[in-house]
Amino acid sequence: AGFAGDDAPRAVFPSIVGRPRHAGVMVGMGQKDAYVGDEAQSKRGILTLKYPIEHGIVNNWDDMEKIWHHTFYNELRVAPEERPVLLTEAPLNPKANREKMTQIMFETFNAPAMYVAIQAVLSLYASGRTTGIVLDSGDGVSHTVPIYEGYALPHAILRLDLAGADLTEYMVKILTERGYSFTTTAEKEIVRDMKEKLAYLALDFEQELETTTTGSAVEKNYELPDGQVITIGAERFRCPEVLYQPSLIGMEAAGIHETTYNSIMKCDVDIRKDLYGNIVLSGGSTMFPGIADRMSKEIQALAPSSMKIKVVAPPERKYSVWIGGSILASLSTFQQ
């Protein structure tokens, strides 16, 4: 969350609401009935955590309201009734959801005006384009969204329920095979950090595996919060490989490359060339080093041989949805 015209968000926190498991034991401690974001994360030992956004879609409006309240009053410290609000939604978000979102903004927060934009479209704006296909992959869901002249093409949008959370789960699994156990939510956070700091995508998975068995060039050390140091090797590229081979976690789905290709093939034949030449990556789960080269290679194998393919991975892609929103909301045409 942040303000239009800024080049980075003012507040970044997980969409989590935590409620105390037990009624207040310590009287007068001023225990809140709910904690949001980082505070919920840090007090998770005494809380029951809930995630109101599942696979990119809001499914718990009371908790979502808590998150918005926290955003306005604690993070941004603005009165929502004084400023127009731009919210984002997942592609293919049900109409009822958008209506509910609008209702809460106007009735609960008294916003003077609001607009709901599709996340992937904002990412494309942030990259300075109005035509292209965006692969947006976050924690709960991935989407491929073809956009032509600023408009998303709903019939060609594809959703893949495979994203960051699944990669973290898989990392936990393959580390368990090595004898390291991570079970609690706190420990899973450690694995997520390990994934974000050390994982990368191999250009050629099989070849990378062979190289790893002979040498130790891939091995890296990671220090756990208690000071213990663990060494991870092939796990570094085995983990994000799931994006290209969902079968590794037993999912019968097309990988992100194939989903992108399928999405392009659902579009009019005349615009495919523009889409192949503008494949834009967005979201935290596209932050792995090597992802753009690998994507390029995989799409080239699927596309017609003469096709010019360009995969764009902007350095700020973790927040490009937000940045696109900041750009859009500061346009004078938008404010009217």
Curated annotation (Swiss-Prot):
Gene3D superfamilies: 3.30.420.40, Actin, Chain A, domain 4. GO terms for biological process: cell division. InterPro entries: Actin, Actin/actin-like_CS, Actin_CS, ATPase_NBD. Belongs to the actin family. It comes from Solanum tuberosum. It is found in: Cytoplasm, Cytoskeleton. This is Actin-46. It catalyses: ATP + H2O = ADP + phosphate + H(+). The keyword ATP-binding applies. The lineage of its organism: Eukaryota, Viridiplantae, Streptophyta, Embryophyta, Tracheophyta. The keyword Nuclease does not apply.
